[in-house]
């Protein structure tokens, strides 16, 4: 396995639905990638992750409740959402006791991808997640290539299709950036071969956001310190948050390459790898509304 090839392959796979499954609702492009942080605890402490420092990202053991999951599922159905919901976020999703219910409920409204370290996974759970209609199970292997044999046996024993599970090589050292698309998590960590923090365009808030365990909505998964909330899912609906003033402010600034506010001003994430179509549409919308020039017509 090759870490760079793994990363490129994952980006290409995600691009199929992130960039090509765009839905226009009331004249604006809906997000196509929604990340859920189901539980604020992880059983690992990887050095490239803020969870390795309890002063930055302590385990609180708080978890998302069923009411929020039910509300999210209903709203995605109403919006005719065509993107993906990713279960990962700030903790290990398989530690949530309702993971099967959550997967099954969200799968009625969306593609569901689960990102896990695989530590608590067994063949029965793998089969249950498949039966709950999860689209993909992505297993990040941190211990070494010997894990490949273990998980391939698990796939065979569970009798799920081979392409349901994606094994990702993440066992590399700091010299190879641990096999991940390394960032400083919006200025939270400084390890590995970090790229220089240059103020460049970012498409993240044009096509995605993250929902925390309590319903707080954040720009993207880079904001590990939870510095700026866009709204709360338990108090508002997704669409109103998505087109609201907080998102608009950050979206407009980042489309201009202006990383001037927290958490963006400390972030070195390369934010243009996905979401170009969304960004182009948002530019037309803002050009039309705020500058009085011809742009995308809003119905």
Report each predicted region and the residues it spans:
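Conserved AdoMet/S-adenosylmethionine-binding subsite of the radical SAM
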Residues: 73, 96-206
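Conserved alpha-helical substructure of the radical SAM core
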Residues: 2-136, 274-299
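Processing junctions and N-termini across compartments
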Residues: 36, 40-43, 196, 258-261
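Short cysteine clusters
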Residues: 42, 46-49, 202, 220, ...
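Short, acidic, Ser/Thr-enriched surface-loop or helix-capping motifs
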Residues: 211-212
């Amino acid at each position: 396995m090759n870490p760079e090839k793994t990363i490129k392959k994952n980006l290409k796979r995600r691009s199929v639905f992130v960039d090509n499954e765009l839905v226009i609702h009331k004249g604006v492009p809906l997000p196509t990638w929604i990340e859920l942080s189901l539980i604020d605890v992880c059983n690992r402490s990887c050095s490239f992750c803020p969870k390795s420092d309890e002063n930055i990202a302590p385990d609180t053991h708080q978890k998302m409740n069923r009411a929020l999951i039910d509300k999210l599922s209903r709203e995605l159905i109403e919006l005719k959402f065509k993107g993906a919901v990713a279960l990962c976020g700030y903790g290990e999703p398989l530690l949530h006791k309702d993971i099967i219910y959550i997967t099954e409920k969200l799968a009625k409204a969306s593609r569901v991808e689960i990102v896990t370290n695989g530590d608590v996974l067994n063949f029965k759970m793998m089969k249950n997640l498949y039966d709950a209609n999860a689209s993909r199970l992505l297993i990040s292997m941190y211990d070494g290539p010997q894990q490949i044999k273990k998980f391939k046996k698990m796939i065979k024993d569970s009798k799920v299709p081979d392409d349901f599970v994606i094994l990702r090589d993440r066992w590399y050292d700091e010299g190879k950036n641990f096999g991940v698309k390394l960032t400083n998590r919006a200025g939270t960590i400084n390890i590995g071969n970090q790229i220089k923090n240059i103020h460049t365009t970012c498409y993240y808030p044009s096509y995605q956001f993250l929902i925390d365990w309590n319903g707080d909505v954040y720009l993207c998964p880079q904001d590990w310190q939870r510095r700026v909330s866009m709204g709360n899912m338990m108090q508002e609906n997704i669409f109103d948050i998505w087109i609201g003033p907080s998102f608009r402010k950050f979206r407009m600034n980042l489309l201009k390459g202006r990383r001037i506010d927290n958490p963006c001003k400390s972030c070195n994430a390369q934010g243009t790898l996905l979401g170009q179509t969304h960004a182009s549409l948002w530019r037309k919308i803002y050009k039309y509304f705020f500058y009085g020039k011809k742009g995308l017509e809003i119905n």
